[in-house]
Amino acid sequence: MHIEPGILSGAKIAAANLAAIALVAAQAPQLLRKPQLVLRTLLAALFFSVFMQSFHLPAGASELHFIGAMPIYLTLGFVPALLGFGLGLLLQGVVFEPADLLHLGVNFLSLAVPLLALHATLGRRLAAGAATRIGAVLKLDAGYYAGVALMVGFWPAMGEVATPFAEWTAFAAAYLPVVLIEPVFTVAAVRLLQSQAHRPLVQLCFAVPARG
């Protein structure tokens, strides 16, 4: 989901950075109201970074990553997932790919806007009671990664260099296995945490309720 340097003009990168800052600023006050979200945001950034670095390869106009979006969202919550994506991208840029820091806002929006849209629609309805059902999690994954694919298509469409449509379709198609495999991982993680939800440390670190 990374956008390569040279595709967007400096003005568009600056606009994306401002939009990213505004999105983070809108959610950050919740960390003050609920201090446990700070820990969960750090965990989200850690898990996201591990997932991203564990598997990545070129795919069409961008790169294919195992993002782990739904495991993070359903076990840590919306705000930690959203802010954790931004913090994780920042840490990965500093440690592994300094060149990616130029597009930090762009790459953050590619992940955050689909999550925001999903949370406002399917997420609120399905996340609470359906996180242990493969079919429901599959809907969340499909909705989220469709959004990521659209965002990755949006940036080249706004770019200074023409990107062949075939490259975007190759990128979008590359995420189909992720959409099919990630729900299994998500449900397993949620069920494991639910079985341990009575433990104080799990209650502090995760947003998974105990099994009813």
Model regions and ranges:
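Membrane topogenic helices and adjacent juxtamembrane segments
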Residues: M1-A45, A142-F154
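Membrane-embedded alpha-helical hairpins and interfacial helices in multi-pass inner-membrane proteins
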Residues: H2-E4, S9-G10, L57, G123-A207
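Alpha-helical transmembrane segments of multipass membrane proteins
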Residues: A20, F48, M52, S110, ...
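A generic, lipid-embedded transmembrane alpha helix
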Residues: R40-A59, A81
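Small-residue-rich segments of transmembrane alpha-helices in multi-pass membrane proteins
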Residues: T41-S49, Y73-L76, A112-L116, L138-V152
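Hydrophobic, membrane-inserted alpha-helices
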Residues: A45-F48, H65-M70, L87-Q92
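Interfacial aromatic-anchored transmembrane helix boundaries in multi-pass membrane proteins
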Residues: M52-P58, L89-L118
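Generic transmembrane alpha-helix motif of multi-pass integral membrane proteins
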Residues: F66-A81
